[in-house]
Amino acid sequence: MNGTEGPYFYIPMVNTTGIVRSPYEYPQYYLVNPAAYAALGAYMFFLILLGFPINFLTLYVTLEHKKLRTPLNYILLNLAVADLFMVFGGFTTTMYTSMHGYFVLGRLGCNLEGFFATLGGEIGLWSLVVLAIERWVVVCKPISNFRFGENHAIMGLAFTWIMACACAVPPLVGWSRYIPEGMQCSCGVDYYTRAEGFNNESFVVYMFTCHFCIPLTIIGFCYGRLLCAVKEAAAAQQESETTQRAEREVTRMVILMVVGFLVCWLPYASVAWYIFSNQGSQFGPLFMTIPAFFAKSSSVYNPMIYICMNKQFRHCMITTLCCGKNPFEEEEGASTTASKTEASSVSSSSVSPA
C-alpha cells in the first residue's frame, strides 16, 4: 500500500521515515509546501466572498418580488439554499482548517463538514434533475395538458432532500465514513480504504450509481429532448427570425447547463472512482484536492447559469440593488419582451430555464 491508514484517516504517503502523523492532531506540511495550505485557504475565502452574496441575493430578491414566487422558482431557491449549505458547512470549515495545516476540528468536525458539503452538493445536483424534468415535461409535453404547479414544486423539493439525505446520512451511521482527504483539510466519503465494518465498497458503488450516473443520464435525456423540440419548432417556421433566435438561446442554455454539470462533478467523480478501483496505488495529496474543491466552486456558477440568465430575475435583481430603480429599464424590458415572443413559438409555457 502506497499510503498510511490509521483510525479514521488515510494519508497518501508511506510512513517509512516516521514523519506521518494523524491529520486530526498535527500539521500536514510534510505532504505539500505550507504555501499550498495558504493558497487553499485563500481560494476558500474567495469562494465565500462570491458564493454567499450571490446566493443570499437570490433568496432575498425572490422573497422581495412577488412575481418571482412561482412554483418553478421554488426549485431555483432550493438550489441557492444548497449552495449556502456548501458555503457555511464546507467552505468556512476548510478555510479555517487550512490555516492550521490539518483538520483541527477533530472527528466530530470532520463528520459535520463532510455531511454538510455532501448534503449541499446533492441537494444542488437533484435540484438540477428536477429542473431538467420540469423543462422536458412542460416544453416537450409527454403528458398532455400538464401544468407545473405549487404541489409539483413541493414534491420536487421533498424529492431533492430525500435523495440528498440518502447520500449524506449513511456515512454518519456506519455505512462508509467521512475522513480527511487530499491535503487533509477537508472531509469526504472514504474512497481510499476497505476499513473493516464500514462496507465502503458497497456504499461507493451505490453512490456512484444512484447519485451520479442516474442524475447525469436524466439530465442528458431531458435536455436532449428539449433541444430536439426546439429544433423541430424552428424547422417548421424557417422564415421566423424570432424562432431562430429562440433556438440559439435555448441551445446555448442547454450547452451551459450540461457543461456546467460535467465541469462540476466529472473530474471529482473520475478521480474518486480511480482511487476506489485502484486502492493502494500511489497518488499525491493534490490529486484529490484539486478536483474536490473545483467541484465545490459550483456554488458560485450554479446561480449564474440557472438564475442570472433569467431576464425577469435579472431585472428584479438590478432593481433591488439600485434601490427600486433599474437604470437599464428600457433595455431589460425590450429583452424580456423579445424573449417571451421567442418562447411562445416553441411552447405556450416557455423554453427558457425559468
UniProtKB/Swiss-Prot annotation:
SUPFAM superfamilies: Family A G protein-coupled receptor-like
Disulfide bond recorded as keyword: yes
Residues that carry a glycan: N2, N15, N200
Family, per entry: Belongs to the G-protein coupled receptor 1 family. Opsin subfamily.
Residue positions of motif 'Ionic lock' involved in activated form stabilization: 134-136
Claim: RNA-binding is one of the keywords in the record: no
Location of region: Disordered: 333-354
GO annotation, biological process: absorption of visible light; G protein-coupled opsin signaling pathway; visual perception
Gene3D superfamilies (alphabetical): Rhodopsin 7-helix transmembrane proteins
Subcellular location: Membrane; Cell projection, Cilium, Photoreceptor outer segment
Lineage, highest ranks first: Eukaryota, Metazoa, Chordata, Craniata, Vertebrata
The protein, known as: Rhodopsin
